[in-house]
Amino acid sequence: VSATRQTIGVQAPMATAIADVAEARRDYMDESGGRYVQVIADGGMGDSGSFVKALALGADAVMLGAPLARATEAPGKGTHWGSEARHQTLPRGYRTTVGTVGPLEQVLFGPSHQADGKTNFIGALKRAMASTGYVDVKNFQRCGMVVNPYSAR
């Protein structure tokens, strides 16, 4: 869990940030004669739904800190802490117990035994793509999105 937002007041909602950067990348490709810049989503990707949404919004890669920390082979043995946590005079993160859910292969490829988004990330991506009619990730990255605003309670 990162406390950067609370500590230094810097944060953009991840979906908005990914979509804005992907759009800026498209503009840059036009201006630079086709030079492609990778978009890597990092932060708040704790479940397969967030992973799928990041790709749908245009990310080329997704950092999966907490999900990978849940694998039984992970060195933290069910504990996760982001690199932002380490700072000499201004720590901004917390060591978090995320637990273990199974081997890395199960985290990535399943099977899932609960509908909590903690395992089978690739299966979730395949299901989302099939449900929306996409057969490849490149086109899925450009799918239309509808944002439904809500207020947290």
Model-identified regions with their sequence ranges:
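Gly-rich Lys/Arg/Thr-decorated short loops/hinges at beta-loop-alpha junctions or inter-strand turns
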Residues: 1-6
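Alpha/beta catalytic cores of nucleotide-metabolism and tRNA/nucleoside-modifying enzymes
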Residues: 8-41, 46-153
